[in-house]
Structure formats: structure tokens, C-alpha cells
Regions:
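Conserved GNAT acetyl-CoA-binding A-motif
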Residues: 149-158
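Conserved acetyl-CoA-binding loop-helix of GNAT-fold acetyltransferases
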Residues: 123-126, 132-145, 168-172
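Short coil/turn motifs at secondary-structure junctions
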Residues: 110-112, 129, 162
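Conserved catalytic-core motifs of GNAT/GCN5-like acyltransferases
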Residues: 158-159, 174-191
Length: 196
């Protein structure tokens, strides 16, 4: 089964990909799927607090998702860009077969010094109960299409060295390891480049 379709969702063109029987897309949440988004974020936040896991992408955890309208307004950084920020687009990965959100990406439109060092163009993450099912690889593939639409020709993705699953997902999308650096938290981080 191989389906690829293109559709408009809240002004963001998003590809729908079936990969290993996955029917997923990167979308902007709306009132129609508010409950599914809150359920995912509640589960994810509980995992972060209980297991002290890395909150990635961090942007989706900066605001109270129960204040839904304000939450959606805060997700993206738009022009004019505040000092110390770059424009970003945050999209959530929706599985249409399961009717749930499974992850999120935060796409930085260009890199500043800090992002070039250890942040990259794409921050991504998969909700705890849906990890190790292939979603990350498929979601990154969709995020790379969004990067291409923004005119980005070479994408930097970074992950902590101990995050083997994330590294595999990046490599599965053509990531080539350039080097390892210490991030802002002094954690060893791998820097991968993907040519589009």
C-alpha cells in the first residue's frame, strides 16, 4: 500500500504519507482535534516529569496547552522576529488511521549561532506510547518536505548522542554525521546534515 497525497490544512500544505501502513500528515491543530492534542501532550508531559526525559521539541512544552487558543497562537515565531529568536513553524504529526497525534516538529526557517551549534533546523519528538514504531523516520521525511518549501537546501538536525532512536531516524532520512559538540546543557550532541 503506497499512498501519497497533498492537501491544504489551515494554510499549511502538508503531505500525507502511507509508510508501513501509516497514514500520517503534519498539520496545525484545530478545535476539531483539540482533545487528541491535549491527550498527547498530557501523556508526554507526564513522561517528562516521571522519567526525566528530554522535552523535544521544546517549543511545544513552553505554554499551557489547556489554554488551547493561546497555546496555538504561541507555537510559531513569526515576523517581526523578537531578539534572540528565528522564525519557526510548529506542526503536529497526525495518524488518520488511529485518529491520534503521534508527534511534533518545530522547523526553524534559518539558523542563528546557537542553532547552528547544536539546535538545527528541525526539533522533533514522538509521544511516549508511539515510539519505536517508525513514526519518527516518516515524520522527519515530511518535515524535510516543509524545509524544502521554505527554500532550505541543506538541513541540520541534532540529537543527543545517547538517543540512538533519534540518530537512526535522522540517518534513515539521509543524515550524515559531521561532528559531536556539547549543547547548552553540556550534553554530547551529534550534528547531522541532510541535503535536499
Amino acid at each position: 500500500m503506497k499512498k501519497i497525497g497533498i492537501g491544504m490544512l489551515k494554510g499549511i500544505e502538508s503531505s500525507i504519507v502511507s509508510r508501513n501502513y501509516m497514514n500520517i500528515a503534519l498539520i496545525k491543530p484545530s478545535e476539531d482535534n483539540k482533545e487528541q492534542l491535549i491527550e498527547m501532550l498530557d501523556e508526554w508531559k507526564h513522561d517528562i516529569e516521571t522519567n526525566h526525559t528530554n522535552p523535544s521539541p521544546r517549543r511545544i512544552f513552553r505554554y499551557d496547552h489547556h489554554d488551547f487558543t493561546n497555546y496555538l497562537e504561541q507555537l510559531d515565531v513569526k515576523e517581526p522576529v523578537p531578539a534572540g529568536r528565528v522564525p519557526t513553524t510548529t506542526l503536529f504529526c497526525y495518524d488518520y488511521d488511529k485518529n491520534i497525534f503521534v508527534g511534533a516538529v518545530n522547523i526553524r526557517h534559518y539558523l542563528d549561532e546557537g542553532l547552528l551549534h547544536s539546535g538545527g533546523h528541525i526539533g522533533d519528538g514522538i509521544r511516549p506510547n508511539e515510539r519505536r514504531k517508525g513514526y519518527a523516520t516518516a515524520m522527519i521525511a515530511l518535515a524535510l518536505k516543509e524545509c524544502k518549501k521554505l527554500g532550505i537546501e541543506r538541513v541540520l538536525m541534532c540529537c543527543r548522542k545517547d538517543n540512538i532512536g533519534s540518530a537512526k531516524s535522522i540517518i534513515n532520512n539521509g543524515g550524515v554525521l559531521e561532528n559531536e559538540v556539547l549543547d547548552e546543557d553540556d550534553v554530547l550532541t551529534q550534528r547531522y546534515w541532510i541535503d535536499l
